[in-house]
């Protein structure tokens, strides 16, 4: 099975070595066919604490690292503007 990858935005970086990444997806409604937006939040491992809120990142599936963490940050695509 191929390793899954997602691109999303960091919405929380308050945990040590962990970030919460929101991944948006547009899918058709099952019955009515209207295109609706879905957002899924993944906890991802950030070894160097390099990610901050607002960063656009790529995450990939990994082995379970904790009870809820099964993704890891591979790279920061666009860094957020920080003062």
UniProtKB/Swiss-Prot annotation:
Gene3D superfamilies: Nucleic acid-binding proteins (2.40.50.140)
GO molecular function ontology, one term from the record: rRNA binding
Keyword Ribonucleoprotein: yes
Alphabetically ordered keywords of this record: Ribonucleoprotein, Ribosomal protein, RNA-binding, rRNA-binding
GO cellular component assignments: cytosolic small ribosomal subunit
Biological process (GO), any one: translation
KW RNA-binding (keyword) present: yes
Self-association and partners: Part of the 30S ribosomal subunit.
Family that this chain belongs to: Belongs to the universal ribosomal protein uS17 family.
General function of this protein: One of the primary rRNA binding proteins, it binds specifically to the 5'-end of 16S ribosomal RNA.
Record protein name field: Small ribosomal subunit protein uS17
Organism, scientific name: Acaryochloris marina (strain MBIC 11017)
């Amino acid at each position: 099975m191929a390793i899954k990858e997602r691109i999303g935005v960091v919405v929380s970086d308050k945990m040590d070595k962990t970030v919460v990444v929101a991944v948006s997806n547009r899918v058709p409604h099952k019955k009515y066919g209207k295109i609706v937006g879905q957002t899924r939040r993944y906890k991802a491992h950030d070894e160097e604490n390099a990610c901050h809120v607002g960063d656009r990142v790529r995450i990939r599936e990994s082995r379970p690292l904790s009870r809820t963490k099964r993704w890891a940050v591979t790279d920061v695509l666009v860094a957020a503007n920080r003062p």
